[in-house]
Amino acid sequence: MKKTGITLIIFLCTFIFSCNEKTRDKSVKELSIFEKVESVPDSIKVDDIIIYNLFKYQILAHKNDSFDSIMIIDKVYNKQPKIWKELYGVLFDHDMFATEKGMVKWNKEIFRNKKDSIKSRVNTLLDCKFDSTLNASLAGIKKLTGRTPKNIRLSIILAPVEGIGFGGMENDAFILDLLDNNFDVINMVEEGIPHEFNHFIYEPTRENDPNKNTPLRLTIDEGFACYYTYKYFDGKISKSEAVEQMTDDDWNWYLQHEKEVYNKCSPYFFYEGDEDPLRGLGREMNAPKTLLYWLGFRIIDFYVNKYGPDSWKDIYNLPVNEVLEKSGYIQYIDELK
């Protein structure tokens, strides 16, 4: 075969291969957000946990440059009405969240106004394989504690207002808001789920605790969720990272102000009013992150250092005041200058 013939064959093969590659790349790159979320299941069920992917229909309602208000009402509003009527409707705006008209109005605007952010954060969620992480977190808490959370209903949503991120009012009215920029999506999935799982298990054990409605209970509850997350990752994250992704500077701020933090907080430990005094103190002191999370973690860490590496499991059974008293933390604070 002549050299020109060989060259032509090589050129054609290269051209065809290049076209095939471009076609494959194009099909991947041009897969729209609508095509991606269409393959997302409406819900995921693991044991007594159900995840409702409400964001799926908040996006699909905008497919084909139109807006399907019936889809929003049927697949988003009526699917989990409690989060809209009793959570967002109470905390933010009743007409906006607790009525069909209000829900349709803001859902009609949200995709147009926040399209880039929605695409980015939804893609991040899909890439981090949320369902696998959920299964791993559940297996982890079963192994570590011998307990499993009950009656959990978590809705993944796109909300037009920030302020909740990952949380809720009761086990069956929890949300993960993909659009809350105060939270990193991967962190919410990988570290937020273990944290919340411990809340779901710990809170039912407070039923007979005489101080279940006090700031001390909230402090121990949040600190314990952070401590469980630290144990769950078995040394792969630091203590500071387990407490709301604190930096070393954040942590050191608390160490430098530790006596002041405790002395300002402790008079409110058994307060039973409607306010949230410890969060207010955190703002007043310009404390980094959330003051009561760090303080609760610190108390539990002292308890574990005193009673042994597996003693953190005692916290599920002890009244919160007993955790504080037995931890030795009060004595430590008294000795600080």
Describe every region a protein language model picked out.
Residues 15-18:
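C-terminal motif of bacterial Sec signal peptides marking the signal peptidase cleavage site
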Residues 6-10:
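Sec-dependent N-terminal signal peptides
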Residues 85, 257-337:
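Pan-zinc metallopeptidase signature
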Residues 24-131:
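Non-catalytic architectural context of zinc metalloproteases
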Residues 1-5:
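Positively charged n-region of N-terminal signal peptides that target proteins for export
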Residues 20-22:
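Bacterial signal peptide processing site
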Residues 101-244:
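Acidic/His-rich structured neighborhood in mature extracellular/periplasmic domains
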Residues 27-62, 213-259, 330:
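Post-HExxH zinc-binding segment in Zn-dependent metallohydrolases
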